[in-house]
């Protein structure tokens, strides 16, 4: 009888612990679609390991802890970003932003977009080269930490937006298309204070098939 009781207790305890773990791990660190050294020399292996493996992991852990027991506990990431503020928004925003950022690159990237995106860029800026210059300028002139975005409104009209800290254009009703990270942890190991060089180099690894 005691053995059965202890077995039942262990089962209940383990299920309870599994449930707690499941809640804590609601959001998980995304797997990179390339090796950690695949984007060199544009982004070094060391930067990827710190940026993805440590910085992003911390945001994921923080977010999971912050949303437990709140109305966001079962919400998807975009909903949390749109409806939250404070620490929850900051960490959710950083998780969403980094998920988009890390998956838009490829060691076989570069070149130019094609199709509808290429046409929309030409309509908005006259040429792809003009668009590149404007996005680089936006990223270089953004004061402090943040993100520079190519985004589209509900009619498909493109714009470049600068968002401080964890900002994302979805909070303005826009659809994110492409983003460059201008937090120092994204480039300082490789480019030190040369943010402009970092932004210019990123074009070499943008996977336009993913972006489009």
Name what the model sees in each region.
Residues 1-22:
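Bacterial Sec-dependent N-terminal signal peptides
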Residues 17-212:
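Feature for soluble, non-membrane regions of globular proteins
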């Amino acid at each position: 009888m005691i053995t059965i009781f202890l077995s039942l207790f262990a089962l209940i305890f383990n299920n309870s612990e599994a449930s707690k773990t499941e809640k804590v791990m609601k959001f998980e660190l995304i797997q990179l679609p390339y090796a950690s050294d695949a984007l060199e020399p544009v982004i070094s292996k060391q930067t990827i390991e710190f940026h993805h493996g440590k910085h992003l992991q911390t945001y994921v852990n923080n977010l999971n802890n912050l949303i437990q027991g709140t109305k966001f506990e079962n919400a998807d990431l975009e909903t949390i970003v749109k409806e939250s503020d404070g620490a929850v928004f900051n960490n959710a925003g950083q998780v969403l932003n980094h998920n988009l950022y890390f998956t838009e690159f490829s060691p076989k990237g570069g070149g130019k977009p094609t199709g509808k995106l290429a046409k929309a860029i030409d309509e908005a800026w006259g040429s792809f080269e003009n668009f590149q210059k404007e996005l680089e300028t936006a990223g270089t002139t953004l004061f402090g930490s943040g993100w520079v975005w190519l985004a589209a409104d509900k009619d498909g009209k493109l714009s470049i937006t600068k968002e401080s800290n964890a900002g994302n254009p979805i909070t303005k009703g826009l659809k994110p298309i492409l983003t460059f990270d201008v937090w120092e942890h994204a480039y300082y190991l490789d480019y030190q204070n040369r943010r402009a060089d970092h932004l210019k180099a990123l074009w070499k690894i943008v996977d336009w098939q993913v972006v489009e």
